[in-house]
Amino acid sequence: MTDDDLTHAIIGCAYKVHNTLGPGFLEKVYENALRIELEKAGFRVKQQEPINVVYDGQIVGEYYSDLWVNERVMVELKATLVLAKAHEAQLVNYLTATGINDGLLINFGPSVQVKRKFREYKPKIPLLNAILPTRSI
């Protein structure tokens, strides 16, 4: 399955969740429901995976990704009226910190909003091993 196919399937699952639950719930409700839907579709999903940003051998920041699908697509969820540039920047930062190339920003607002983002900066050090020491690659 290509990354395009994978992101398309994730988006389809998000629409199914939104069509079932409707708008108005907290982000965590949609996160849990989307994880269930993705797992039913046969995907490997990690939820609230820690992202440690390392500088000079020391952790200088820590984030948590909402969902990580098949260890290839980072999914950041929101439940707000509209998406803001800050939401997009958050996802791009997660992509940069992990070395993952592909991400989806999905908003479960009055209607589903989806933005696909790609890693913009390619660090000079191999980040996946340095930043996610708890993960096996």
Range-by-range predicted roles:
Residues 23-30:
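Hot-dog-fold acyl-thioester-processing enzymes
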Residues 41-57:
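A short acidic/basic microdomain associated with nuclease active sites
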Residues 22, 45, 65-83, 94:
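Conserved catalytic cores of phosphodiester-cleaving nucleases, focusing on short active-site segments
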Residues 1-20:
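Interdomain/boundary linker segments immediately adjacent to catalytic/signaling cores
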Residues 78-125, 129-132:
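Nucleic-acid nuclease catalytic cores
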Residues 1-2, 56, 123-137:
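Intrinsic disorder/low-complexity segments
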